[in-house]
Amino acid sequence: MKEDWSDILNLGTKSPIKIHLIGVAGSGMSGIAGLLLSLGHTVSGSDKADTKETERLIKLGLTFCGAHSPEQVNGVDLVVYSSAIKQGNVVYDKAKELGIPMIRRAEALAAIMSEKKSIIVAGTHGKTTTSALAAKVLRGGEKMPSHYVGAEVPILGTNAFWNSESDFFIAEGDESDGSLINYNPEYAILLNVEEDHLDYYKDGIQEIRLVFDEYLNKCSNKIIYCSEDLEAKRLCSKRSNAISYGFDNNDDIWCEIEKIRESSTDFTVYSAEKKLGSITLGVPGKHNVLNALAVVALANELGMEFSGIAQSMAEFRGARRRFDMLYKSSNYSIVDDYGHHPTEIKATIETAKQLNPERLVCVFQPHRYTRTKLMLDKFSGAFSGVDKLFITEVYAAGEAPIVGADSNAIVESIRKSTDVEVELIQCFESAHHVIGAYIKPGDQVLILGAGNVHEIGSLLARDLEVIDKLRRELDDPMTECRLYEPMRRHTTLKVGGPAQYWVEPITVESFSKSLGFFDRLNIPVRVIGRGSNLLICDGGIQGAVIHPSGGEFSEVSVSGNYITAGVGARFKKLNNIAKMHEISGFEWMEGIPGNVGGGLRMNAGAMGTETFDQVVSVKFLDSSGQIYEKSSHDVKSEYRSVPELNNNYAISAVFEGVSGNVRDIEKLTQESMSKRKQSQPIAASAGCIFKNPESIPAGKLIEEMDMKGFSVGGARVSDVHGNFIVNDGKATAIDVLSVINEIKQKALNSRGIKLETEVQIIGEEEIVF
């Protein structure tokens, strides 16, 4: 027979004891820790990592031991463990070995609340919102109950609260491990009953019914149940102490929904045929109206005034991760929700659709392999109405993978049975990059799952706020502002991760404003043109990438032998215009793949000519967006480098040519083109990779080292020119870097030559934003 801890934990006739909690950082266990500390016990706890909750509890007296270790239970009187902790956990095993009494979280909670009039909220879905709402309403009625809810609820202050002066204790009862039967409720609320946690309930719904039935049998006063749920109705409708609620006018408490808004819902409540009044609930959704009706029935039973109930419900704001609005602007909204069961998902999507977004983009993280396996068919029908669905890998929650029960199985099931557009995201760390690059103004992003998927929403919200502020500041609909633009689209080598913020101005004014905006926020800026002579790492570019393109930046004008060109104009365009006006000296530009901006930045060259050989003056912006102009004599230029433009950004330049004739210009142009075609590959490349050493051209050195054709992954040393690395189609930046490093190492070891890269290598090798 199990020991009754009620008297000990409530300090009825006993002194405080030493208690250790295994898994103290979880939302459920942190609440138990808070209650035990309030009761005066000495409490320690361990977990894989600390959280904001553990930091808060430390201030209240918790001894947080950090990661699990056997010695943590030495000298303790009782160990409390969460349902996720099992044999094999070193603290659990040590406590067993020492014979220390051990109880589950639900047993501890039942003991703590045993001296109170307990109100237990049970059901497969909606427990946290309903218990939090009940606590809020009873507070409004000056009953000031103790409470225990399974998530952070800002309006309540904390997830668990002990009030020794109050008779009432409101708690959500967890059914996942059968521990619901530990409670002896005075009032039992049953929201719904469905198949879930089938890793524990091997006999499915039959076994689940038995647990809920026993829970209801132990209720000493009223049972409040939802008649809209067939299983709840089956378990409760014939009980003499049961009160029903729902949308049917035959229910004891029922309602008519008037309006669902983005953050609230209006409905009118009736008791039998009597109108009680109208309520504006501070959270949206039909399912939340049902949760509210359960609380109305409870408060009505406790004799509370309806006006007070309505006021508290209007003031209520939901728990964290329960249709939690992470971000809202005129362009986007991001909603985070804990829903991970098919029924919860359907209800949340229904609520989201009622807000009429232009597109509903859903991100779902399956929770546990066992649930995925047993509910695979139900998941396939849960996402109706979604315009785009992204599915991440399964959040294992400590489970081992099950063959055929992974995220790919859900994706395939959805594709076979629905027309929902679905995409599997295999890398969680870069999931927000994929989603952020997909969404557009007018979209609502709905984040669903019980694991860590909310992190995706938080990262999106962080960066969308910046891009929305930039749009407002620029007030220029022609300037493209996007998140996570894949840089492989903007480099001639066609590799590279995303740009955190991508800005594509077509006017100098917008370019200037963008620089000033990012400068004030201390966000680093890169300016990129056509992306030649550039290798961007796979982790992408943290900060902003500005791509001045089109508009004013593509303008080219001629005055005598002088050509003024914006930085977005291609070198090829300059040569063509020069030829039209019989201006010579630009023929070398014909085969250069870049544009004026990149040429200025790198002092690009060919056929014995460098860019600054022809530059008369440069107009540029500084990092704050101020415009300056300098003569080329005042700008230091070096081989493939112009230091002045490291932290300043060219917007245009004046070039000088010499008088010529079309025939001669055409001849020189063809010679330039022919030479480049014969000596350079046509496959995607960044141009010359290495600077030429003094002793030997880099291409010749690489050829002599027999490294033409050398490859790593999709990156290969060109067979045409040894100083070119080409992308065979699926190269990554790390492939290219590996080839570069192999060449450098061999040159140093075999020839004593230290090669320097001419190509600019920028960005992060790993994901950092």
Range-by-range predicted roles:
Residues L11-P16, L35-H41, I58, E71-Q72, ...:
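Phosphate-binding loop of NTP-binding sites
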Residues L470-V596:
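Anion-binding (especially nucleotide phosphate/pyrophosphate-binding) glycine-rich loop
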Residues E3-W5, N10-H20, G28, L35-L39, ...:
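Nucleotide phosphate-binding/pyrophosphate-handling subdomain across enzymes
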Residues G496, V503-V508, L535-S554, R601-S632, ...:
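Structural signature of FAD isoalloxazine-binding scaffolds in flavoprotein oxidoreductases
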Residues L483, L621-F769:
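Phosphate/pyrophosphate- and phosphate-bearing ligand-binding catalytic cores of soluble enzymes
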Residues S46-D47, C65-H68, I103-A110, Y148-G150, ...:
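Beta-strand->loop->alpha-helix junctions that form or flank phosphate-binding loops
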Residues S380-P441:
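C-terminal helical cap/extension that packs against the catalytic core
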Residues I119-G123, K572-V616, S685:
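A gly/ser-rich beta-alpha-beta helix-loop segment of oxidoreductase catalytic cores
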